[in-house]
């Protein structure tokens, strides 16, 4: 399925909006720090590496999504600390 750049940007914007909303409404998300996220990020990175070594395209896509979620979450957490 092919999407235009505009559609991709809108989808990514919705993704970031959801992260922002979760940081406000979800107690678990709200208490996360860079330090507390690190073990999960390491696990997701290993899962991505495993999928890459197996050349499992479906799993690679899934794990890339998980890693992207972590990167965006770190950005959200760090931005909060920069603006305080």
Model-derived regions: residue spans:
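Extended low-complexity intrinsically disordered regions
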Residues: 1-60
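Glycine-centered tight-turn and secondary-structure capping sites
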Residues: 65-69
